[in-house]
């Protein structure tokens, strides 16, 4: 009896605003895989529709990724390939996907990254700041005590450039926080 070959888990970056930024390799992989695991299937259907991709689309978001990981692992053990995509940018960069990758590695399933857009790297590249050393922190904390802890870390004399994500709804509260704390920072805000 032949041993069944396992599928592959692809981590595919998606555009961060312009669907024409999707790489040809990313399009090919999304076309070829058996299942696309998407952060938000409604938003992903828009991109996939523009790219004329009609593969099986399933949700994989922060509220279900632990439960769905087992399902996707079983599918890959049965020989199917799965691609993880996020609403915009690279999966696992402040988006779901880490749990599935961890489970894939633990189960000996091959994981392949398909590079493309990453909002943090794109913003850093146009900031004009020294990028010989930078730290991506994810989303800026919401609570004042946590914000102060992060600001203290930044003030310790480290010369690294810090990059944070923030929602448009909260950006002004972050700027107000820096002003109130007399942070004396150079800021680059990107959308």
Regions found by a protein language model. Name each.
Residues 1-63:
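Glycine-rich, flexible N-terminal cofactor/catalytic loop recognition
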Residues 30-36, 108-112, 161-162:
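Short active-site oxyanion
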Residues 16-18, 87-91, 168-170:
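Short glycine-rich anion-binding loops that position phosphate/pyrophosphate groups of nucleotides
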Residues 77-141:
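Short glycine-cluster motifs
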Residues 62-77, 96:
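Short phosphate-binding loop-to-helix
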Residues 42-44, 89-90, 119, 170:
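Alpha-helix capping/helix-boundary segments
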Residues 2, 6-7, 118-191:
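Beta-strand/loop-alpha-helix module characteristic of Rossmann-like adenine-cofactor folds
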Residues 59-66, 139-144:
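Conserved helicase motor
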């Amino acid at each position: 009896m032949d041993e069944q070959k396992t599928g592959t888990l692809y981590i595919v970056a998606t555009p961060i605003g312009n669907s024409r930024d999707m790489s040809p390799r990313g399009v090919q992989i999304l076309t070829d895989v058996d299942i696309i695991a998407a952060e938000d299937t409604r938003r992903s259907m828009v991109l996939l529709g523009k790219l004329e991709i009609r593969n099986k689309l399933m949700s994989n978001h922060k509220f279900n990724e632990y439960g769905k990981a087992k399902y996707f692992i079983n599918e890959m053990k049965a020989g199917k390939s799965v691609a993880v995509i996020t609403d915009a940018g690279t999966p696992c960069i402040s988006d779901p996907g880490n749990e599935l990758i961890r489970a894939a590695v633990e189960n000996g399933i091959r994981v392949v990254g398909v590079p493309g857009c990453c909002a943090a790297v794109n913003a850093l590249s146009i900031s004009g700041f020294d990028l010989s050393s930078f730290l991506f922190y994810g989303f800026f904390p919401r609570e004042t005590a946590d914000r102060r802890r992060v600001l203290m870390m930044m003030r310790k004399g480290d010369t690294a450039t810090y990059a944070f994500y923030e929602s448009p709804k909260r950006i002004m509260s972050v700027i107000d926080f820096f002003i109130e704390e007399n942070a004396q920072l150079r800021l680059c805000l990107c959308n």
